[in-house]
């Protein structure tokens, strides 16, 4: 059995709704609160426990994207660019 190409990571400091919005801006369509489908890919979003130091709490989102290799090779760098720029 061959598995589909995929990537996943956990991002701190971004709410789930904003991660979902970024994926929609990159050509996806929201099909559920935690799923965005794009051409050749599907993303699953999961809110994970906040990172906390003292009274400071930072939200985190786990992202798992699978699909065809060509679609992921286009999506990943575009998404990473949005995640490193303040405000997308």
Would you name each region that the model predicts?
Residues 1, 30-37, 55-58:
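Short, ordered beta-strand-loop transition motifs
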Residues 11-15, 49, 67-71:
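Beta-strand elements of well-folded, non-transmembrane domains
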Residues 55-88:
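C-terminal basic regulatory modules in eukaryotic proteins
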Residues 24-34, 86:
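Short secondary-structure junctions
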Residues 5-7, 39, 59-61:
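A generic structural signal for short beta-strands and their flanking turns/coil linkers
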Residues 1-22:
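Terminal, regulation- and interaction-focused segments at domain boundaries
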Residues 37-56:
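A short, structured beta-strand/loop element
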């Amino acid at each position: 059995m061959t598995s589909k190409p995929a990537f996943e990571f956990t991002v701190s400091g971004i709410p789930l709704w904003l991660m979902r919005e970024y994926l929609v801006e990159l050509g996806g369509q929201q099909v559920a609160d935690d799923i965005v489908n794009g051409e050749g890919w599907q993303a699953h979003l999961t809110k994970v426990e906040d990172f906390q130091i003292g009274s400071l709490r930072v939200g985190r989102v786990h992202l798992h994207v699978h699909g065809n290799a060509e679609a992921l090779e286009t999506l990943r760098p575009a998404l990473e660019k949005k995640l490193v720029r303040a405000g997308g």
